[in-house]
Amino acid sequence: MSSSTVEEVEVRGRLRKRRADAGSVRLSERDGQLLRLIGEQYAITVDQLARLIGRTPRTGRWLRDRWRRAGWVESRQLTAAGPSFLWLTRAGTRVAGSPFRTWRPNAALASHIEAVTEVRLLSEQHGLGLWVCERALAKSLCFATPVRAHLPDAVIATGDGRIAVEVELTLKSRARLEALLLELGRDYDRVWYFAVPSLVPRLRELAAALPWQNIAVHPYPPRAAALIA
């Protein structure tokens, strides 16, 4: 076989391989990290994705669309006036190596999920500690004890101990709030409670009456200055 014929065969082979790969999306290390984080949070908004990668909302939408073409995520609004969320498909859960079950969209939880992720973004932006998501806490506790304790929305592990993170967007009964604060204050070194402004006075009053003074109530949305001080 002449050298020119060999070259033609090699070129045709490369073209066939290129056509076979055309349109496919390859998983990068960064893709895997971001997809696993989405699995930890149940879902995130497209705007939150953009901030995670330090890019514009347009780039966040581009990345979301890339993952959607690959079949790794689904994305849509979960409430009529709310933002677009994205969450892992079964294929996305598999390629990311996420240890959690594939989440089924739940409009009733959308605002709370978004709010918890806002706190996580702020915590990680300022290096406040290692974020342990609610899903990981549930996995560890189900093996540790037969008694189901209240799970905070997350725990931030620091050199000084564990900080329970709780986000409250809706009104609960006084008895329920008091029970939550009592349990969290007892079980964790510190508690950061983020609540919509209308709930802050009641929560601060309840926290002040507890036997331990390790609960800080912050208005939501979270502000870095209040946490770093």
Residue ranges and their predicted role:
Residues 76-77, 108-111, 120-124, 128-176:
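Active-site metal-binding core of divalent-cation-utilizing nuclease and nuclease-like domains
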Residues 1-103:
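Nuclease-adjacent, charged terminal/linker segments that flank catalytic cores
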Residues 42, 71, 127, 188-189:
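Structural motif
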Residues 100-116:
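A short, highly charged nucleic-acid-interacting micro-segment common to nuclease
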Residues 209-229:
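Charged, structured surface patches that assemble and position nucleic-acid processing machinery
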Residues 64, 68, 119-127, 184, ...:
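Hydrophobic, Leu/Ile/Phe/Ala-enriched alpha-helical segments that form helix-helix packing faces
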Residues 162, 169-214:
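Catalytic cores of nucleic-acid endonucleases
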Residues 41-44, 137-139, 170, 199:
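Short, solvent-exposed loop/turn segments at secondary-structure junctions
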